[in-house]
């Protein structure tokens, strides 16, 4: 009887964690949370119980990369400053990119996001009907206003034409920041934070929702970023902490004890 009650309790906890994550978490993350709660259970056991409950993590999808053409002058500015760099603090490296968001009635929208590479936190974003340099700068200015980074910050991005524009590069310079690009013929891991973020947004959130208009898309994305991704979504690379909790842990270790 005790074993039956114990298993029932674990099954309930697995379901609670699963539904609290909106069906996003699989056995690795659920196991990590259970262990943090003091429940000693293996990932294999959690996986088996999830099969018993007939639940599973939302599966990933493949999103093709955009291709862009560059002039010889533009190719000359392509330098990757974060390759082999030890990224060990917030506001050391930001990454940014654009991804496509499809709606039923308002067509294709464009989401520009800035991520703190250290914590994977979304620090500035903008949803637009266009993908102009001015749209990029709206998201950039939001991130700067929120984070107030010191000079020397590295802004790393893909090779899209907006990021290669003189206006954008000059804006980076005016803030006393450095710009960095993924290399020509690069592998996707050179902008891995953005690739991972876009995949998470689309497979975990947008794939289960219908977006009819711009307003629907904006509200849905804001709900994911502010309500789940930043404060709650745990990452294995962050020691199974959320981006906000990872930053809190970093700053708590830097604060001298009284």
Please name every model-derived segment.
Residues 173-175, 200-258:
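C-terminal domain-tail junction helix/linker
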Residues 69, 157-159, 165-168, 181-202, ...:
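RNase H-like two-metal-ion nuclease catalytic core shared by retroviral integrases
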Residues 87-123, 129-131:
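An active-site-proximal beta-strand-loop segment
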Residues 121-125, 179-182, 207-208:
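Short small-residue beta-strand/loop micro-motif enriched in glycine and branched aliphatics
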Residues 107, 126-148:
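Active-site beta-loop-alpha junctions of metal-dependent nucleic acid enzymes
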Residues 14, 30, 46, 50, ...:
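Mobile genetic element proteins and their domesticated derivatives, centered on retroelements
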């Amino acid at each position: 009887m005790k074993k039956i009650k114990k298993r029932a309790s674990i099954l309930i906890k697995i379901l609670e964690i699963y539904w609290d994550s909106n069906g996003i978490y699989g056995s690795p993350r659920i196991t990590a949370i259970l262990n943090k709660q003091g429940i000693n259970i293996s990932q294999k056991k959690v996986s088996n119980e999830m099969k018993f409950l007939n639940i599973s993590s939302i599966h990933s999808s493949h999103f093709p990369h955009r291709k862009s053409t560059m002039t010889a002058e533009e190719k000359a500015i392509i330098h990757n400053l974060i390759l082999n760099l030890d990224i060990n603090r917030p506001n050391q490296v930001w990454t940014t990119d654009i991804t496509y968001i499809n709606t039923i009635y308002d067509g294709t929208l464009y989401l520009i996001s800035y991520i703190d590479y250290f914590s994977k936190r979304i620090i500035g974003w903008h949803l637009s009907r266009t993908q102009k340099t001015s749209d990029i700068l709206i998201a950039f200015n939001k991130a700067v206003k929120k984070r107030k980074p010191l000079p020397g910050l590295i802004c790393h991005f893909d090779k899209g034409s907006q990021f290669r524009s003189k206006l954008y590069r000059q804006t980076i310079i005016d803030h006393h920041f450095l710009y960095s690009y993924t290399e020509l013929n690069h592998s996707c891991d050179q902008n891995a934070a953005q690739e991972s973020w876009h995949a998470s947004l689309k497979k975990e959130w947008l794939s289960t929702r219908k977006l009819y208009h711009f307003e629907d898309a904006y509200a849905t994305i804001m709900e994911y970023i502010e309500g789940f991704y930043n404060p709650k979504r745990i990452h294995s690379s962050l020691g199974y902490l959320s981006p906000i909790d990872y930053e809190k842990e970093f700053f708590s270790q830097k604060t001298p004890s009284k």
